[in-house]
């Protein structure tokens, strides 16, 4: 089944997670997620953005950017409004990513639904930012040197860009120069996600 993903007004929290070394295609070793481009860090971020203690956060859209390995970049979207069949553990999320990595990468901007609430497309972070800008999402950067995010006023549509264990590369720094930078403190993370 293939359909084009359109962003609805009910989505409020947008996350872009950049995996600099995470392969966009090929094999993913579920027994060695840290050795697979730090996939462990990426799936933990997805898990935190998607799941509550009692269910799925239905107001979140997470875009995982796989930028490592051979071939073009891939974006995988997890849509909390329709997501089903994914458990809140690293191995389950990584298993979904592994299955997608075996598929050909669709053209940039055309998201193909793989399973309920999970889509993939070609493209990189600039494509995601362009989409968010069109949807009037306020874009912010998660940065250790930024302001505490708990001090931020929450807007209707907030977008947060975060990196894996690597800092933003020079290209990513250029596009993010005018974006507000925040960091999480102990309770800041829960406050923004609650």
Where are the regions a protein language model picked out?
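Post-transcriptional modification and biogenesis factors for structured RNAs
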Residues: 1-194
């Amino acid at each position: 089944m293939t359909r084009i993903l359109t962003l609805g007004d009910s989505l409020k929290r947008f996350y872009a997670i950049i995996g600099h070394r995470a392969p966009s295609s090929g094999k993913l070793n579920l027994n060695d997620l840290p050795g697979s481009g730090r996939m462990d860090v990426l799936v933990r971020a997805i898990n935190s953005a998607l799941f509550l203690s009692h269910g799925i956060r239905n107001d979140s859209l997470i875009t995982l950017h796989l930028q490592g390995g051979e071939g073009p970049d891939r974006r995988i979207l997890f849509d909390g409004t329709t997501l089903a069949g994914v458990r809140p553990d690293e191995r389950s999320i990584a298993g979904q990513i592994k299955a997608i990595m075996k598929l050909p990468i669709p053209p940039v901007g055309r998201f193909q639904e793989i399973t309920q609430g999970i889509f993939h497309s070609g493209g990189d972070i600039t494509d995601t930012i362009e989409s968010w800008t069109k949807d009037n999402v306020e874009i912010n950067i998660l940065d250790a040197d930024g302001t505490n995010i708990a001090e931020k006023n929450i807007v209707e549509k907030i977008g947060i860009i975060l990196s894996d264990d690597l800092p933003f590369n020079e290209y990513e720094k250029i596009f993010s120069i005018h974006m507000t930078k925040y960091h999480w403190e102990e309770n800041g993370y829960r406050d923004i996600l609650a």
